[in-house]
Amino acid sequence: MNKFKYTLAIIKPDILVKQNQNVDKIINKIESKFIIHQRKQIKLSLEEAEQFYKDHRGKFFYERLISFMTRGDIIPLILSDKSLEINNNNNNNNNNTSIKPWRDFIGPTHRDKAREQIGCLRGEYGTSDTRNAFHGSGSEEEAIDEINFFFPHFLENNKK
């Protein structure tokens, strides 16, 4: 049985507001390791941001996160790790997920830890723990929910 191979990534508003010239460079970096299956640029409404981050409601950073995520455009992307395509063709690797490779690629949530990790995107582009430039699904269940949130028909149209 194949594991879920997709993950949801988000390029957050800090990239689009303050570093817009870097978007193409960032997309190229992403495409060096991941296949982009879907992408769009949108601005979340307050209600959409509250729905997307409902699991964080009540946490100390929730209001700051909602305010930040609604201040400008974001780019949600559906990704799969390019190495999965190779591994799936060569053997039955049990690590058939893009979630961990994407989270490793973007690096730790916390800015200072991200800056210590050479080559991670958050270390290069993040400016604070909230304005950390990128989002990555934390689990298969989260990835499914998040992909359905931004791309409601993708998973049903891409069943294998």
Curated annotation (Swiss-Prot):
Database matches in InterPro entries: NDK-like_dom, NDK-like_dom_sf
Active-site residues from the entry: H135
Pfam family, one: NDK
Gene Ontology BP, a term: nucleotide metabolic process
Catalytic reactions on record: a 2'-deoxyribonucleoside 5'-diphosphate + ATP = a 2'-deoxyribonucleoside 5'-triphosphate + ADP; a ribonucleoside 5'-diphosphate + ATP = a ribonucleoside 5'-triphosphate + ADP
Coiled-coil boundaries: none
Amino-acid positions noted as binding ATP in the UniProt annotation, renumbered to this chain: K12, F61, R103, T109, R122, N132
Record field: transmembrane: none
Source organism superkingdom: Eukaryota
Record protein name field: Probable nucleoside diphosphate kinase DDB_G0292928
Family per similarity comment: Belongs to the NDK family.
Molecular function (Gene Ontology), one example: metal ion binding
Source organism: Dictyostelium discoideum (Social amoeba)
Entry EC number(s): 2.7.4.6
Keyword terms of this UniProt record: ATP-binding, Kinase, Magnesium, Metal-binding, Nucleotide metabolism, Nucleotide-binding, Phosphoprotein, Transferase
Gene3D superfamilies cross-referenced by the UniProt entry: Nucleoside diphosphate kinase-like domain (3.30.70.141)
Keyword Amino-acid biosynthesis: no
Protein transport found in the keyword field: no
Needed co-factor(s): Mg(2+)
PROSITE patterns in the record: NDPK_LIKE (PS51374)
Enzyme class: transferase
